[in-house]
Amino acid sequence: MKLINMGVALLMTTTAISVSRAQTADVIVNKYVEAIGGKDKLAQIKTKSIESTTQVMGNEGPSSINIVDGVGYKVMSEINGQTFITCYTDKGGWQLNPYAGATTPMPLPDELYKQGRSVLDIAGPLYNYAAKGNKVELLGKEGNAYKLKVTSKDSIEITAFIDTTTYYMTKVVASASMMGQTMEVTSTFSDYRKGDMGLVFAYIVEISYGGQFNLTTTVKKIEINKTIDPAIFVMPKS
């Protein structure tokens, strides 16, 4: 009987800890959403247009991102006279990558598309996460950040770091396939500023691809709900 009682007590304690962690994760997520503008404003974002510059391997050039929520995401950059494009839509994706020897746009492999299509979610994976089928678990703290494990409905996992003071997202760690190999991709966000509609965005994004090379994007301009022609997401014919 004592063993049964101990087992029940242990189960209740474990359940209580799990519930407490979930509640704490929700508190952190809610504070993050509020810090970047609040759920009401995030719900109003239909499109986002970003003008920026990108530095990679000592070279710099203009870049841009255009997003229509749930419809299409397209990032373009020009480095050393070469144009790089990655595009996701609700049906598939394509890319133009001269570094991989490509001279014409090519469809994204299914696995790469699955890993990256979350970029179609314009408000991000934490906003309204449960309704999207995402799961969030608090892993603890690392330095001055809360560490959250975010699992999408497609079972794609990322680790998000939320500053304990500002509640801005400071870093995201994910796995990605590039040129036939899987690597850890770390995105670091800084220089947060308030812009259109009172929304707050990071103006500097640094990405490390498995320590092999780094990419830094510095935002120049962000426009919310600007008209974006969906035709830009269609892969050009070779």
Regions found by a protein language model. Give the residues of each.
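Gly/Pro-enriched, hydrophobic low-complexity segments
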Residues: 144-234
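Flexible, processing/modification-adjacent segments and terminal tails
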Residues: 21-28, 34, 95-156, 176-183, ...
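Bacterial Sec-dependent N-terminal signal peptides
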Residues: 1-25
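Short, surface-exposed charged micro-motifs
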Residues: 64-65, 83-85, 135, 157-161, ...
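Generic beta-strand structural signal
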Residues: 67-69, 88, 138-141, 162, ...
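N-terminal mature ectodomain segment of secretory-pathway/periplasmic proteins
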Residues: 27-101
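Short solvent-exposed loop/turn micro-motifs enriched in small/polar/acidic residues
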Residues: 57-59, 68, 78-80, 129-131, ...
